[in-house]
Amino acid sequence: MQNPIFTAAESGLDNLLDYLPSKLESMFWSFSTPTRFGQKYRAELESSSDVTVLMHANVVDITTNPSETKVTSLKIRSLSGNEAVINASRYIIATGALENTRLLLASNTINPAGVGNHSGMVGKNYQNHPHVDIGNIVSSDPQALSALYERRAPSGQGDNGFRLGVGATAAVQEEREILNFSASFQEEEAKKILKVMWNEIKSFNWPTDFSSKLKMAVEDLVGQEKRLSHQVYMYTEQAPNEDSYIALTDQKDALDMPRINMHWKLNALDKHTVKQASLVIGEELGRLGVGRLNIRDWVMQDDAKFPSSTWGGCHQIGTTRMSESAEDGVVDGNCQVHGIDNLYMAGSSVFPTGGHTPPTFTIVALALRLADHVAAGSSAS
C-alpha cells in the first residue's frame, strides 16, 4: 500500500501518467544536500557530556574473551603508528558495510575465521542496487515525458532536487515473480549537451570545449530516424546470494590491515527482474500512447548476464545481515552479533535485503533504534 503522504503529493500533480494500479506506480525521489557529519554536528559533539570523539583513531582489532561470547576491548591505531586500547561495556561497529565486514574478518586472534563468523556468514550476501540502461523511448512528442519526468533542481541547489519515475506495484511483483524496481526517464546525452551549451550562450558565456561538445552532440543525433526522446534507467533490488561476498586479501594497507576483495555477483532472478520490469514499462507506455520502448538486446536474453556498464550506486548492503539464527546471518533483530553479548553492528550491512531505494534514510532510522535499545539496556543494568 502506498504511503498516504505520497498519495497526497501525487494529487497535486494532475498530469502524471495514469498507470494501471496493478502494473506500475509513480515514484518520487528527493535528493538532500550533502551532509558533512563533522561540520554539521561538531559544536554539538564538542559540547556533549556523553560523547568523546577520538580523532585519527582507526579501529584495527576487536578482541573477545576465549569463548567468543563477549568483546573485551578494541585496538586503535593511527597512521603515524600510535596504538591504544579502548575498553567499554558495549561496542557498536558503524563503519559501513565494507569496513564492518573487514574489521570482523580481520579480528582473528581468537578465531581464525574472525569475530561473529561461526557459521561463515560474515561478508556473504553482498548486495548493491544494480543500475542499468534498459533502452530508449521512441516518441512523437518527447516534451510530454520531459515535462513529467526530468530531474529538477531548485535554483542555486546544483544537483540537489527531485525526480519523478515509475516503480513496481506489489501486484506486478507477485504476478511476474520479480524483485522490486524503479526506473527514471532521462534525456538523451546529446540533448543534455545542447541545452547546457545554449544556456551558456544565452548568458553571454561562450561554452568551454565548444567544438568537442558539439561533436559529441552531433554524433549522438546523426542517424536517428525516429524521435529517441529518453533513455530509461532502471534501479533494482538484488536478490541475496552467498556467491556475492566480501573477502580479505593478502595485501595490507597503511594501517597494516588486510585489504578486501569484492566479489559482486548478480544471478538469474536479478536478470529476470530487469527483463520483466522492462516489458511492463514498455506495455504501459504503449497502452498510454506515450511512446514505444526500444529494449536493449541484452535485457531480453534468458540468462544471468549483465553488461559491463552495470554499477551498484555505491550502496553496500547485506554483509552482516540480520537473521533469526546465526546459521542464516550475523546479527539478530536488535543488531546484536549472534552469540556475543555486547557487540552490535550498525549500517546497511545488517539489511537482510536492500529493496531498490537508496539506503541512507533506513540506515539512520536503524541507528536511532539501536541507540534506544542500547540506552535502555544500560539503564536497566
Please provide the spans of the model-predicted regions:
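FAD cofactor-binding and catalytic pocket of flavoenzymes
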Residues: 1, 119-259, 268, 313-316, ...
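Conserved redox-cofactor binding core of oxidoreductases
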Residues: 1-65, 71, 302
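Patatin-like phospholipase A catalytic core
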Residues: 1-29, 191-216, 222-226, 275-277, ...
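Non-transmembrane alpha-helical segments in soluble domains
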Residues: 42, 104-105, 278, 282-285, ...
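Beta-sheet entry/capping signal
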Residues: 50-53, 74, 83-92, 125, ...
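A glycine-rich dinucleotide-binding beta-alpha-beta segment and adjacent secondary-structure elements
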Residues: 54-67, 219-238, 242-243, 255, ...
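Glycine-rich loop(s) and the adjacent beta-strand/alpha-helix scaffold that form part
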Residues: 62-65, 74-152, 347, 366, ...
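A conserved FAD-binding loop/helix module that cradles the flavin
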Residues: 353-374
